[in-house]
A protein has these predicted regions:
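Glycine-rich, proline-tolerant flexible connector loops at the mouths of alpha/beta enzymes
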Residues: 36, 40-56, 75, 100-118, ...
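Conserved anion-binding
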Residues: 78, 84-93, 99-159
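Conserved, mostly hydrophobic/aromatic
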Residues: 19, 57, 92, 133, ...
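Glycine-rich phosphate-binding active-site loops on the catalytic face of alpha/beta enzymes
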Residues: 21, 71-75, 79, 94-109, ...
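Alpha-helix-loop-beta-strand connector modules within alpha/beta enzyme cores
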Residues: 51, 55-75, 114-139, 169-196, ...
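Structural preference for beta-strand elements that scaffold enzyme active sites
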Residues: 15-17, 45-46, 66-70, 98-101, ...
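Catalytic cores of alpha/beta
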Residues: 79-91, 140-152, 175-190, 194-211
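Conserved N-terminal beta1-alpha1 strand-loop-helix module at the mouth
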Residues: 1-95, 142, 147, 151-154
C-alpha cells in the first residue's frame, strides 16, 4: 500500500492519518464522548478503543462515515489462547467494530511455530474486517521481524502496527526499515509516544500510512496554528 507524504503545504491532510486512541481503562463515558466528538469535528480517520467501549463509541459516532471504529484485540500483550482471541474479534465485529488492531502470539514467533503464528492471524482475518497486527516491532530481532511480516501478510493482515504504546516511541528509522521489509504490500501504522506535529509528520514522510496517538487533537490544533502563521 503506497504511502502519501505530507509536505508543509498539505497539513490539511493530517486528520486522514490520525487514529485517535481511547485505550485508557480509567476513561469514563464523558471523556469517551469528548474524544468521539473530536473525531467527528476533526474528521479523524479512526477511533481506536477497547471492546468494553465499542458500543458507547459507536452510539456517539452515530452516522459519521469518516471515522472508522477500530477495536483492539488481545490488547496489550496478546498472551491469551487463540480461540479466545478469535472470540474477541468476532464479538468486536458484532458490536460495531469496522477494523481490528490485533496483538499476536509472540511465543509462537520466538519458538519457531510460525505456522501457528500465521494461522491465528488468518482466522481473525477470515472474519472479514480489515486487520492490522501489532508487532511491537522495535523489540523484535530483525530476522524475527522479517519473518513475522511475511507471515502476517500471507495470513491476510492489511497492516502492521509498530507497537502497543507501552514500549519505545515510534521513530523515523524504524518506519523506514518496516517500509523496506513490507515493500508496499500492506499499510504501516506508527504508534507509541507520538505527541507532536513534528513527530507525526516525520513518521508519515518516512512511510507511515496512519498515526495511532492519544494526542490527535493536540497534533491537529498544532497543525492548524502552523497554517495560520504561514
Amino acid at each position: 500500500m503506497p504511502y502519501k507524504p505530507i509536505n508543509d503545504e498539505k497539513h490539511n491532510d493530517l486528520p486522514s492519518f490520525i487514529h485517535q486512541a481511547a485505550l485508557d481503562p480509567h476513561l469514563n463515558l464523558d471523556a469517551l464522548n469528548q474524544i468521539c466528538d473530536a473525531c467527528i469535528h476533526f474528521n479523524f480517520s479512526g477511533l481506536c478503543t477497547t471492546l468494553n467501549k465499542l458500543s458507547p463509541a459507536k452510539k456517539r459516532l452515530g452516522q459519521n462515515k469518516k471515522t472508522k471504529l477500530i477495536a483492539v484485540i488481545a490488547f496489550p500483550f496478546g498472551d491469551i489462547p487463540s480461540a479466545i482471541k478469535k472470540k474477541e474479534a468476532e464479538w468486536a465485529a458484532e458490536h460495531g467494530a469496522e477494523e481490528l488492531d490485533v496483538v499476536p502470539n509472540f511465543l509462537n514467533l520466538y519458538e519457531g511455530a510460525i505456522e501457528d503464528f500465521a494461522e491465528e492471524i488468518s482466522k481473525i482475518s477470515s472474519i472479514g474486517l480489515p486487520s492490522r497486527v501489532i508487532l511491537d516491532t522495535m523489540r523484535l530481532p530483525k530476522e524475527k521481524l522479517a519473518l513475522a511480516i511475511e507471515a502476517c501478510i500471507d495470513a491476510g493482515a492489511q497492516g502492521i502496527q509498530t507497537g502497543n504504546g507501552f514500549g519505545f516511541a515510534a521513530n523515523q528509522t524504524h518506519i523506514r526499515e518496516l517500509r523496506s521489509l513490507i515493500k508496499n504490500r500492506c499499510a504501516i501504522k506508527a504508534a507509541g509516544g507520538i505527541k507532536s506535529l513534528m513527530q507525526a509528520l516525520e513518521l508519515i514522510n518516512s512511510g507511515a500510512t496512519s498515526i495511532g496517538t492519544s494526542y490527535g487533537v493536540d497534533i491537529t490544533k498544532e497543525s492548524k496554528n502552523h497554517l495560520k502563521q504561514k
